[in-house]
Amino acid sequence: MSLIPNNWFNTGRRSNIFDPFSLDEIWDPFFGLPSTLSTVPRSETAAETAAFANARIDWKETPEAHVFKADLPGVKKEEVKVEVEDGNVLRISGQRAREKEEKNDTWHRVERSSGQFMRKFRLPENAKVDQVKAGMENGVLTVTVPKNEAPKPQVKAINVY
């Protein structure tokens, strides 16, 4: 039995007196105040823009390169920019325009997202930023950043007397 009721502070999660993090709301000076985000008027396209703005990008490292893959369905390669800024920051950006609406059309559902996106990645020191390559195929952007070869350790033989 908990000494603190389940609906205390209306957080939706069960409080546990033995869990030091379950009572964090007590010490939060802003807890219970209305969120400013909830009072901001949202356009009808805000949700779809947010979905596209958070373009998901995978980053893997192989022995030869850093490889970035982004799912960008419906985006043309002309609408995507891949840049290296400040010497070691990879910037991937672009936009997908919203379809032109005809006055006689009635939309029953709009689930495809549109809008702008931009993601930045700080590249490691071993990246060859002057040899970055990018390609787009079937709505997937692939950016390859080659790596410098790791310096081979120099071995010096020591004579034993």
Curated annotation (Swiss-Prot):
A Gene Ontology cellular-component term: cytoplasm
Disulphide bridges: none
Record keyword Metal-binding present: no
Coiled coil, from the record: none
Residues of the sHSP domain: 48-161
Domain of life the protein comes from: Eukaryota
Protein keywords: Cytoplasm, Stress response
InterPro entries: A-crystallin/Hsp20_dom, HSP20-like_chaperone, Small_HSP
Subcellular location: Cytoplasm
Family named by the database record: Belongs to the small heat shock protein (HSP20) family.
Quaternary structure (record): Forms oligomeric structures.
Protein name, UniProt field: 18.3 kDa class I heat shock protein
Gene field: HSP18
